[in-house]
Regions:
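Acidic, polar ligand-binding/catalytic clefts
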Residues: 83-106, 234-244, 249-250
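Sec-dependent N-terminal signal peptides
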Residues: 1-7
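Exported/periplasmic ABC-transporter solute-binding proteins
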Residues: 14-56, 63, 67-68, 72-73, ...
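Pocket-flanking alpha-helical
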Residues: 67-99, 215-217
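C-terminal motif of bacterial Sec signal peptides marking the signal peptidase cleavage site
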Residues: 9-12
């Protein structure tokens, strides 16, 4: 109810007014462009489609790029909304405020970082320490990871060298240190990471879990059948009992170790359509879309029920 009232107030107050910058968009109408890390495109596209259906006078034009370029566009005033896996830095907030912007970060979802391997690779358990050793080059072969694995040199596959995925690995898994592995491949998009892993038996790919789920499974417990999703353990060595797949429940209870927040970063002094879209995602309908997509909502009641997993 509160969201509807605010929406109506902004629409009626701003609908016919043009700002000094020439903008005419309101909380629920007009045309804007926004930027997003490409790894979040599935969930952002779902949110955008519903928002534009509910508010047909609004047009949202997405630009999907890497996290670094997305935030640079936001900081330089080329856009008023960016979706990222990191919050503003204090220095960025001060810089934007000095330019009369209004930097605000809104939590919209929790996403898990998933490790995927070829369908022919039977090893599906990995510990955080194993991941650290692979990323720093201490482990280079599958046989170093698990004795008896006949696969050869491990090829690590990322979506983009400047993506939120790489940033998370370096910042949260490696403690701020860079990746040092000679066998790293950076493709252009997350869909290409999945394709690379499908076609290369020695590959291990790192993607956001909103790319994994079978859209026909309302329980979000069925992953893409063309690849294997690894179970990750905080404890080393990884065992079946200590390892978890990036299911919503394990994100919710904290047992899956690789979880990140998705932020809507705003620098819009007008509080127009960028604010409307960001708050829609954080609102009841937007959070239901987040849940349906296999991510974890930041707001709302979570109901847990038992299901059988045949995977």
């Amino acid at each position: 109810v509160g969201f509807s009232i605010v929406l109506a107030l902004f629409s009626s107050c701003n609908n016919s007014k043009k700002g000094k910058d020439g903008r005419t968009d309101t909380y629920s109408s007009g045309t804007i462009s926004f930027v997003s890390d490409e790894s979040f495109s599935p969930i952002i596209e779902e949110e955008r489609a519903v928002f534009q259906y509910d508010y047909p006078q609004a047009t949202l034009n997405p630009i999907y790029t890497n996290e670094s370029d997305a935030i640079n566009k936001l900081l330089s005033g080329k856009t008023w909304l960016a979706f990222s896996a990191r919050n503003f830095k204090n220095s960025e907030i001060q810089s934007l405020k000095a330019k009369n912007f209004r930097p605000v970060a809104i939590d919209i979802a929790y996403d898990a970082l998933a490790f995927i391997v070829n369908k022919g690779n039977k090893d599906t358990l990995i510990s955080v320490k194993d991941i650290q050793d692979i990323m720093t080059g201490r482990i280079t072969k599958w046989s170093n990871l698990h004795k008896g694995n006949a696969h050869g040199t491990i090829t690590v596959v990322f979506d983009n060298p400047k993506s939120s995925t790489v940033h998370y690995v370096e910042d949260s898994i490696l403690g701020g240190k860079p990746i040092h592995n000679k066998n790293v491949v950076a493709v252009n998009k997350t869909s290409q990471v999945i394709k690379y892993v499908e076609e290369n038996p020695d590959a291990i790919g790192i993607i956001g879990n909103n790319w994994l789920n079978d859209k026909h499974d309302s329980t979000n417990l069925t992953f893409n059948k063309n690849i294997r999703v690894m179970s990750v353990s905080r404890i080393h060595p990884a065992t079946a009992n200590s390892s978890r797949k990036p299911y919503q429940y394990y994100i919710y209870n904290g047992e899956y170790p690789l979880v990140r927040t998705i932020y809507a970063l705003l620098n819009d002094p007008r509080q127009g359509l960028p604010w409307g879209f960001a708050h829609f995602i954080q609102g009841p309908k937007g959070q239901r879309i987040v849940m349906k997509a296999g991510l974890l909502p930041v707001l709302g009641d979570i109901n847990v029920r038992d299901v059988n997993v045949n995977q």
